[in-house]
Amino acid sequence: MKKNQFLKESDVTAESVFFMKRRQVLKALGISAAALSLPHAAHADLLSWFKGNDRPPAPAGKPLEFSKPAAWQNNLPLTPADKVSGYNNFYEFGLDKADPAANAGSLKTDPWTLKISGEVAKPLTLDHDDLTRRFPLEERIYRMRCVEAWSMVVPWIGFPLHKLLALAEPTSNAKYVAFETIYAPEQMPGQQDRFIGGGLKYPYVEGLRLDEAMHPLTLMTVGVYGKALPPQNGAPVRLIVPWKYGFKGIKSIVSIKLTSERPPTTWNLAAPDEYGFYANVNPHVDHPRWSQATERFIGSGGILDVQRQPTLLFNGYADQVASLYRGLDLRENF
């Protein structure tokens, strides 16, 4: 695998900063403006994060043992870990970016069960300890591009999904991989209350083609910044597919099912004209309500430091993944 030379020092992002462009979709689902919070409050919250970290630190995760393969390392300075764990998209805990850090402490991540089933010869069940001990862990510094036109760089820790799927031995009928988040409304307020959770249908579900899932870049992620994932980042295990928009990165996974048919996905169900199944980062295919040609690389400085730069096809991973889509119309299959 080639080293990711496209990363520059300016690419390293202040993980704290997100933009809330999907609020209009949530309104279309019947969520009132009041329930989505007042604009002034949202703006004040965003600006408070640009000014600096004045929030309580996220609970410290357990330190992990992992390697640092040269292909996924660089000399870039990373932004403080408390910001990536303090400003998140995880609607099961609320719509505002600070809600997951405030509310996700209710999620019990140990014990945990992850089942691999469907079109496999050997169904598997992993427990909490298996997630960090069954496979060698490695740190990978990946770019992440949100569909909302911001981007960041994160040192995720995990293992390639293909190693897990190989143990289950996919059958010849397996064409897709379906993922499902835990359904625990007593722990996740957004699953109880549609005003908190944006009116989405829960549990959150996602999917990949089998060849996408088996690609070496696709990572089952159990840690970040050297430690186990905190709940607000998708503990104890989440998916990272770095050439796709961030909503493909399903969190707190309890089920992986191999299927012969394309599985449903949450945002595609909510707004099929806006969020496709593939969700490949593509500067030539705009969102219906904003351009995807450029993105905000948001650093650790103040709000005036935020600048736009061109979005890279497949988020800069075209050399590795473009062959997966040879002959596919990327405008039709967005």
Swiss-Prot record:
Q: Tell me, which GO biological process terms does this entry list?
A: protein repair
Q: Where is the signal peptide?
A: 1-44
Q: What is this enzyme's EC?
A: 1.8.5.-
UniProt keyword Oxidoreductase, yes or no: yes
Query: Which reactions does this protein catalyse?
Result: L-methionyl-[protein] + a quinone + H2O = L-methionyl-(S)-S-oxide-[protein] + a quinol; L-methionyl-[protein] + a quinone + H2O = L-methionyl-(R)-S-oxide-[protein] + a quinol
- Any idea which positions bind Mo-molybdopterin? 88, 91-92, 146, 181, 233, 238, 249-251
Question: Where does it reside?
Answer: Periplasm
- Presence of the UniProt keyword Signal in the record: yes
Q: Which family does it belong to?
A: Belongs to the MsrP family.
Subunit annotation: Heterodimer of a catalytic subunit (MsrP) and a heme-binding subunit (MsrQ).
**Name this protein carries in UniProt:** Protein-methionine-sulfoxide reductase catalytic subunit MsrP
User: What organism is recorded for this protein?
Assistant: Escherichia coli O127:H6 (strain E2348/69 / EPEC)
